[in-house]
Regions:
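Helix-loop junction within the histidine kinase core
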Residues: 30-41
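Short conserved segment of the HATPase_c
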Residues: 133-145
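Conserved catalytic submotifs in the C-terminal HATPase_c
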Residues: 40-45, 62, 67-77, 114
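Short alpha-helical segment of the dimerization/phosphotransfer core of two-component systems
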Residues: 14-19
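Glycine-rich ATP-lid/hinge loop adjacent to the conserved G-boxes
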Residues: 146-156
């Protein structure tokens, strides 16, 4: 029975849960930037991991009427990473892509192995045909509080989530870059270095 009181309580619960998630993310960002978060590094086939991450999004794509394409590698690519954190970063970007893409739009996940200045990287590109990001926000998109404007295109959760993605890539000595056109979509590119020489000899 959906009485007004029950509906009000349900709304309060959702808002409270959302606020707690926001606070948890903020505290996590503060811990990362204070050097309190340590990586749990293991050698992983990123091709297998990517399939595990992207597979559930095919069902979401069907439900939302979005064309979801995955272009991966045909052979293993071993990386030294914190599986939980890298997985979370990729899911965050994919979730945002679906969130801001309308039915009949496209989301593309593409993985490659590339070389830059003699160094090998895993390149993960997540692009969409969504709303795009306003030009005035692009230069500070990875800051925690860029969305105080609360525009219809963005929310505080997205701003903090992207900050966590940026921090995760920093911890892995990688990069995350954005290319976006308002009204046409966005492309996020992750570059994760191969090998483990870039990590400190001490605990990470």
């Amino acid at each position: 029975l959906q009485t007004p009181s029950i509906l009000k309580l349900a709304a309060m619960y959702r808002n409270g849960t959302s606020l707690q998630t926001l606070v948890d993310h903020l505290l996590y960002v503060q811990k990362i930037e204070a050097g309190m978060i340590k990586l749990r590094i293991s050698k992983v086939d990123i091709v297998v991991l990517a399939k595990q991450i992207t597979d559930p999004f095919h069902e979401l794509a069907e439900t939302e009427g979005i064309n979801f394409t995955v272009e991966s590698l045909n052979e293993p690519l071993l990386l030294w990473i914190d599986v939980e954190k890298i997985s979370s970063a990729i899911r965050n970007l994919l979730s945002n892509a679906f969130k801001y893409t309308s039915p009949n739009g496209k989301v593309i996940f593409k993985m490659n192995r590339i070389e830059i200045d003699g160094y090998s990287f895993c390149s993960i590109i997540i692009s969409d045909t969504g709303k795009g990001i306003p030009e005035e926000l692009r230069g500070r998109i990875f800051e925690s509080f860029i969305t105080g404007e609360n525009t219809p295109l963005f929310s505080n959760k997205v701003g903090i989530g992207l900050r966590i993605v940026k921090n995760t890539m920093d911890l892995h000595h990688g990069t995350v870059n954005l290319d976006s056109t308002l009204g046409k979509g966005s492309t996020f590119t992750l570059l994760i270095p191969e090998g483990n020489a870039h990590f400190c000899r001490g605990p990470v």
